[in-house]
Structure formats: C-alpha cells, structure tokens
Amino acid sequence: MLIHPQFDPVAIHIGPLAIRWYGLMYLAGFIMFLWFGRLRIRQPHMAARGWAARDLDDMLFFGVMGVILGGRLGYVLFYKPSYYLTHPLEIFKVWEGGMAFHGGFLGVLVAMWLFARLRQRHWLEVTDFIAPMIPCGLAAGRIGNFINGELWGRPTDLPWGMIFPQAGDNIPRHPSQLYQFAGEGVALFIILWLFARKPRPMGAVSGVFLIGYGGFRFAAEFAREPDSFLGLLAMHLSMGQWLSLPMILIGIAMVVWAYRRQARSGEERPVTDSGA
C-alpha cells in the first residue's frame, strides 16, 4: 500500500505570486507541442505541404483559447449544468477549478477550424497535423492531477493501491491519474507519432487519435472514481465513458472513410485537399 506524497500545489512563490504545479504542467504541454511540432514540420511529407514554424505559433494561440473556453464550458454543460444555471457568475471563476477534456477537445476543434479558414487549409489537414502532439498535453495534465491528489481511482487491494488523503476515507485506491498518463499520454503519443511518420490519407491520423483516446479513456474510467455529483449513469458507465464512445465510433468511421476515399481516387499518395 502506498500513500500519496501530498505535494504542495504551489510550485514556486515569487513575492505575492504563487505559481501552481498544474499551471506548470499546462506550460510543459505547450512547450512539448512546439518542440514536437517543429520535428513534425521537418518530416518530408509535412514539409511538402507547406507547414512552417509560424503556423505552430498561431495554432498554439488558437489551441490555448479553445482548451480554456471549451474545457470550462464543457465542464459546465456536461457535469454541472443545473448548478451553473442557478449560479451563472460562477462560470467565470476558472481559477477555482472545473475543466472537462471533452469540452476542451470540442473547443480545440472549433479553434482549428478557425485556423484552417485563416490559412486556407482543409480542417482535417490541420487536425491531422496536430493530433500526434495532443497526447503531450494530456500526459502533462494527468501528472498535474496526480500532484494535486485529485481525480483519484476506485478502491483496490492491488499492491500499488494508494491512499489519497483528499478522499477522506483512508482506503487504498487506483492511482488512475497515472494510468491515464500512461495510456492517453505516453502510449497514444507513441502510436500516433509512428503512424503519422508516413503519408496517410487526409483524416486518418485524426481518426486514429479519436479511437486511441476514446479507447484508453473508456478503459481507464473503470479504475477511476466517478464524479461524486454524477455517479454512474446508464449501463453502469461513467460520464467520461459515455462521452468517449462517440469518439471511438466517429474515429473508426473517419479511418474507413479516409482510406476508401483514397482508394476511389486511385492515388498512391494521400489526398490533400485545399480550402476550408
């Protein structure tokens, strides 16, 4: 049995300014996005499509806005709509916590659509480009969850079960944050990076991301404690699982569509449409 280390959520104090670990994890995710994005630009099939370093800076700006706005609205709409309906001003108190990945994901999709319009590229061409880097941010975020001792797992008698003092029950639980770090972070990054190293039909990389994230998240939810204010929903599945199922189905459909489209076109190289 292990006990959570109880890290100080504040990493650095600079005068009256308190820099929290969770904020540093966001920063780490953005830095990794830029780092691996520059490596991706150097891949021959990406360079041939005209991707440049300045695109990364703009994509990061749009992406950050999408994550923050979408993540917050997703939490409000998916998890606590009735509460925020009666306390609308609480929606703006982002510093008090309350972000949802699925909402942030939708926010990023909208942001990348706007970026695609600005750059006169196809939306799926943009999402295919960024998909391999997204797990970097997911991995950093899960480490932030673990440092904060939040989003702990369900009770377990496994040797690596961990007591999270914030849970208030002194029961060993799955360190589900680390499961998600390993699955939707590390493993998904490796899968996508290797898959995207070669030219693929437009939409295929995005589809593999949806399948991979949805699958890893769906599996991890069996070890993660459901939100106390929601519990388990229909068929004893959590909200995270119900939101992940459409991602898996849409991802499968996208991969099938992408390869069928390529086969119909008779092209040996992937299709790269222009225009939004």
From Swiss-Prot:
Molecular function GO labels: phosphatidylglycerol-prolipoprotein diacylglyceryl transferase activity
Keyword Ribosomal protein carried by entry: no
InterPro entries: Lgt
Annotated pathway: Protein modification; lipoprotein biosynthesis (diacylglyceryl transfer)
EC number: 2.5.1.145
Keywords carried by this UniProt record: Cell inner membrane, Cell membrane, Membrane, Transferase, Transmembrane, Transmembrane helix
PROSITE patterns reported for this sequence: LGT
Keyword rRNA-binding (UniProt): no
GO biological processes: lipoprotein biosynthetic process
Residues annotated as transmembrane: 17-37, 59-79, 95-115, 129-149, 176-196, 202-222, 237-257
Residues the entry annotates as binding a 1,2-diacyl-sn-glycero-3-phospho-(1'-sn-glycerol): R142
Bilayer topology annotation: Multi-pass membrane protein
Location(s), subcellular: Cell inner membrane
Name of encoding gene: lgt
Family in the record: Belongs to the Lgt family.
UniProt protein name: Phosphatidylglycerol--prolipoprotein diacylglyceryl transferase
Record PANTHER family: PHOSPHATIDYLGLYCEROL--PROLIPOPROTEIN DIACYLGLYCERYL TRANSFERASE, PROLIPOPROTEIN DIACYLGLYCERYL TRANSFERASE
Role summary: Catalyzes the transfer of the diacylglyceryl group from phosphatidylglycerol to the sulfhydryl group of the N-terminal cysteine of a prolipoprotein, the first step in the formation of mature lipoproteins.
EC class: transferase
Any single GO CC term annotated in Swiss-Prot or TrEMBL for this entry: plasma membrane
